[in-house]
Amino acid sequence: MLTKKPEINTILQVTPDPHSLPAAMATEDLHVYYGDNHAIKGVDLTFPENKVTALIGPSGCGKSTYLRALNRMNDEIDGCRMEGQILYDGININRKEVDLYNVRKEIGMVFQKPNPFTKSIYENVAFGLKRHGMKNKKEIMERVEKSLRRAALWDEVKDDLGKSALSLSGGQQQRLCIARAVAMQPKVLLLDEPASALDPISTSKIEDLINELKNKYTIIIVTHNMQQAARVSDYTSFFYLGEVVEFSGTSELFTNPQEKQTEDYISGNFG
């Protein structure tokens, strides 16, 4: 736990109210249950377009469960059920008739541990494109290159596209996973502690990449690292026991929290 607040620019810049900006996604009264365990309890959050929102909180607070709910990944867990609305493009996607394949194309996800396919670097990015019906080899190659460039990986792998993705370093593998996600041209990227398993240099590259990607995508990131949240996010939501304690601009939340629980957590006096 930190013993001091994350460093924030001493000149406090007031961040626009997230509800005043165009929303990429939102949840209304969202509940998630694992059997009898009530993991997420009536969460209302709005995610502004082309901004980075960080979800922070102690281990087991529900932030990763909430993130997985946003593109219905929790549906893959036996005994999990969800209630409430998950709004994307103004449509509630928390309905049985919704095509989850399309949901996950529009709302991409990158997990904590890099999980490249046991295929070539090229095939890792091209696989989803082919699955979605893209057949023209030139178009596929163009999309692969574009995606690898956006993930700041192209210059490192352009001469080795046929090599196994498993030959890459951990940081490169994670950027490959980001390239794989952006190749599907999503509008939203969900990042579940994407740098927690990486060394400091690779972490720095991922953070730089996040700052670049928000020009094209709305990014929602779970992180246990409050310094990282302060560096990369525009908005931050503090979760505790499955509820949102506080949600505001990142600079405001870290320099002038409105709730005592938030103050205690970011000051290292929690628990």
From Swiss-Prot:
GO biological process: phosphate ion transmembrane transport
Major localization listed first in the record, in broad terms: membrane
Gene Ontology MF: a single term: ATP hydrolysis activity
Membrane disposition: Peripheral membrane protein
GO cellular component: plasma membrane
Catalytic activity: phosphate(out) + ATP + H2O = ADP + 2 phosphate(in) + H(+)
Compartment list: Cell membrane
SUPFAM superfamilies membership: P-loop containing nucleoside triphosphate hydrolases
Domain ABC transporter span(s) in chain numbering: 25-266
Top EC class of this enzyme: translocase
Pfam families: ABC_tran
4Fe-4S found in the keyword field: no
Alphabetized UniProt keyword annotations: ATP-binding, Cell membrane, Membrane, Nucleotide-binding, Phosphate transport, Translocase, Transport
Chain positions recorded as ATP binding sites: G57, P58, S59, G60, C61, G62, K63, S64
EC number from the UniProt entry: 7.3.2.1
Similarity comment text for this entry: Belongs to the ABC transporter superfamily. Phosphate importer (TC 3.A.1.7) family.
Assembly description: The complex is composed of two ATP-binding proteins (PstB), two transmembrane proteins (PstC and PstA) and a solute-binding protein (PstS).
Purpose of the protein: Part of the ABC transporter complex PstSACB involved in phosphate import. Responsible for energy coupling to the transport system.
UniProt protein name: Phosphate import ATP-binding protein PstB 2
Organism of this sequence: Listeria monocytogenes serovar 1/2a (strain ATCC BAA-679 / EGD-e)
